[in-house]
Amino acid sequence: MSDKRPRSPCSNNNDELNDSSVLTENMDTVATRSKNLPFHETYKSKPTPADKPYRVDGIDKYKELYEQSIRDPEGFWSQMARKELRWLRDFTKVRSSGTCLQDRLAWFLNGKLNVCDNCVDRWAEIQPNTTALIWEGDDPSSIRHISYIELFRNVCKMANVLKRFGIKKGDSVGIYMPMIPETIYTMLACARIGAVHMVVFAGFAAQNLLERLVNARCKIVVTADQGSRGKKIINLKDVVDKALEKIPEIKTCIVFRHLNGPIEFVKGRDFDGETLMRSEKPYCPLEDMDSEDPLFYLYTSGSTGTPKGVQHSTAGYLLYAAVTQKYLFNIHPGDIFGCAGDIGWITGHSYLVYAPLCNGITTLIFEGVPTYPNAGRYWEMVERHRITHFYAAPTAIRTLKRLGDDFVKKHDRSSLRVLGSVGEPINPSAWRWYHSVVGEERCSIVDTYWQTETGGIVIAPIPGCFDTKPGSATFPFFGIEPAILDPDTGKEIDGPGSGVLCIKNSWPGMFRGIFGAHYLHEIYTKPFPKYYFTGDGVLRDQDGYLWITGRIDDTINVSGHRLSSKEIEDALTNHFGIAEAAAVAIDHDVKGNALVCFVVLKDSGNRTFDLNNSSPHPFEYELRMCVRTQIGPVATPDHIIVVENIPKTRSGKVVRRLLRKIATGCNDYGDISTVANPECIKSIESSWAQYLKR
């Protein structure tokens, strides 16, 4: 299988991350977002039922536990690990001497455990009939309840299926599946036998799937015939077939018939998943896994442009996901956790699959979208399943807010105790609506900040501890020591101020590197050595509350999905008519960010490609389809503008901050002395104005 190595972070594609002037320029852009933040608007913490006491009762208890976790991380996390996880062999050392990615980072050394044992077996033993999974399909009438004992049997059968095809400890398994229980069976089956799963979001195109399957060195692919979202059918098997045409090394594809759509089986390669599972025994022995054995790879876009296979460990990841959920959402036995995130992203991995099951509660897996068959779908599910916790993206919250309160108020939401937001900073007006309308001013709002690389939430308010402020991520979780750094000097800023968000030291859930390209850890460490560089700006107010102000690298967040500017630009320049492209994000009321792409034509005199004078233009459709086909629908540009030139530094770097300012109507461009071709600015302004008049 060919090895498509991502480019070195020392190449020109990544020089911007190591250029403090670029970080400073980007900080200027995100700083404008903080001007109208409600620093002095607070909401009191909510009372909780007597049988659901707060895990941390008050700010004094939080300070005590937090200070312990920073002062004595070994003592704090060893106690948590022995309390929350079932070990097959106890660990002998809590963590290695390494405290960051440059070192050989390891937690719970010499310990043995199995993730599936912790998420399935131990609960099947003591509460076999408790519901583990509630699945609700795109069609509201399609509902399945799976108990812990049923989950155990199905996972064991799927594990035996994988073993039948020679999958063993350390092998990679590609998963390209809709939001159905079989997806979770497959993930847990991998964990049971020591295989490493690599889930790909089922909205990605064949090229994206191909790149990830190759990079992760997958031995087998598990998929379904089709998926359905908002009555829209996604032909998953067709995408897999197209990807596998170029990967002859993958000789097995397991296909689940979810919608019984028409599919063609490739003889000798494709096998029916249900038929295979029916023929297997409902028991499969556990594999003893070392604490540091990889559990999964999950690919995320970054500033290098090449998707990165983030690698997470077995013990540290599972512990951190479970503990953050238990404390930040005040989890208790009998709770029903409704995470609206997709399993193809880290939110689904951590807070739909691993944390709820490790905590022994019920988790919802929802195939559909929040607006189908109407905008009350989320709240209808809350009423139907008596969901106690709901965790959704600000994009969805903003969409539902815009569609009106009636869709919310017609459904009983009295079961809810905690409402969470995830994927991007939630704007204050959406926060207030979530609190007052959805939560009826009685639910705690947990605005969470974290990343694929962190494994779990790193900054968020713990219910019962603090007053909350709309739009603020509030305070760090246990073991997380945030640092606000000056982008020019790299020095820490104490007290109120804004800068680059970094994290000191390590924590159990921290990723262990980039699979197949461990040198890429420089992306996270080179800008500020000995710190974890998040790529986000942050502001700390007079009360110590933290406010995430947005990306300061060239990663774009659209509807909670992290996309790379470079990846989008490459897709556009793959079109025969495009010489250069630059992608930037501007604020969008619903999606958080809208994608604006500036393109330079290879034949600048060809009026056939004049997008700025007609609407819609066939060529514009072609370019959008280029991006959709190569990356996926989530990356579809909102605006495409033809320009004569793109502003660059003398070393050839695109000055995206200028393009952002033009697209947002800001005429204060600041210092442009580093721009090699400042004469192009007026021309771009004119092209943008012409485009807006279409």
Curated annotation (Swiss-Prot):
Q: Which domain of life is it from?
A: Eukaryota
User: Would you indicate the residue range of the signal peptide?
Assistant: none
Q: What is the lineage of its organism?
A: Eukaryota, Sar, Alveolata, Apicomplexa, Conoidasida
Q: Which residues does the annotated region (Disordered) include?
A: 1-23
**What biological processes does GO assign it?**
acetyl-CoA biosynthetic process from acetate
Q: Which GO terms describe its molecular function?
A: acetate-CoA ligase activity; AMP binding; ATP binding
Q: Which reaction does it catalyse?
A: acetate + ATP + CoA = acetyl-CoA + AMP + diphosphate
User: Which keywords fit this entry according to its UniProt record?
Assistant: ATP-binding, Ligase, Nucleotide-binding
What this protein is called in its record is Acetyl-coenzyme A synthetase
Q: Where is the composition biased (Polar residues)?
A: 9-23
Binding annotation for ATP: G423, E424, P425, D447, T448, Y449, W450, Q451, T452, D536, R551, R562
Q: Which family does it belong to?
A: Belongs to the ATP-dependent AMP-binding enzyme family.
**Which InterPro entries does the protein's record reference?**
Ac_CoA_lig (IPR011904), ACAS_N (IPR032387), AMP-bd_C (IPR025110), AMP-bd_C_sf (IPR045851), AMP-binding_CS (IPR020845), AMP-dep_synth/lig_dom (IPR000873), ANL_N_sf (IPR042099)
Which organism's genome codes for this protein? Answer: Cryptosporidium parvum
According to its UniProt record, the EC number is: 6.2.1.1
